[in-house]
Amino acid sequence: MKYYNDISIIIITYKSDQIIYKFVKKIPKKIKVIVVENSKNLVLKKNLEKKFKNVKVYLRNNEGVSSSLNYGVKKTKTKYFLHLSPDLQVDYNDIKVFFYYAKKLRDNFCALGPRFLKTKKRGHIQIDKKLTIAKIDSIHGSYMFMNKQKFNKIGGWDKKIFLYFEETDFCYRAKKMNLFCYQINKIKTQTIDTTVKIENKKLRQNWLNLLIWHFIWSKFYFSKKKNGFLISLIIFLPIIIRILFRIILYKITSDKTKLTKFKFRLNGLYNSIKGNKSFLRLNQIKN
């Protein structure tokens, strides 16, 4: 397709060895692919670049999704880029649909995204199924079509956010600049795999606790940017009370797993309220 010369695909990986080969294999060979590899897997880099000539892998310290995407965008030389998570089902014929609407909108947009299938309504807001295309507050960060110039104009993703709410913050800032997000219902995707695979049970639990910590940290951080500190404190007060109640409950019932989970949640929220960085990393969590 003629569109392939004007787009790059950016994939961010972290301990994604088991799925990345299968995912990259399905990408048309004429599309440039940039892989930002955050677990510094040199073997993965060598094998991917040897097997797929359209792929370039960059090894980095894990500084989070935002920092990684910003880095990947800097490495692109095309007008547009598609940020994809390797756990998704993607039909690359849909690229022509993205280009059609990008042209129709005269590139005056923040991001374009697909309709996600088999998702929970509460956790993933989407436009009405009957619509062809419509504005939406935020496009899911795992599948975003963007214009590089507009991405840079908006200021990229906030590198202070390690994980979660990166796209929400980005789309919020874009909206204030009258650059809107659009969901295209003709383009569909769904999650078919797991991005991070950790076999060790204890390490897997540590990973889940890390996600809990960063989710609440980022949630308050974004709320503070949007609503201000005092209003955010009021909004989060019921959450703080629920967390403290759960900690007391699981201490009484001696449920160590759930107790640890809510301690991580409380700690993440505490550090975000204090204005501390999203510092927690997997290797810092001890069993």
Where are these regions (language model features)?
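Short, well-formed alpha-helical segments that are part of the catalytic scaffolds
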Residues: 11-29
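Acidic donor-binding segment of Leloir-type glycosyltransferases
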Residues: 24-58
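Glycine-rich, basic loop-to-helix element that forms the pyrophosphate-binding segment
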Residues: 60-76
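Conserved donor NDP-sugar-binding/catalytic core segment of glycosyltransferases
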Residues: 92-124
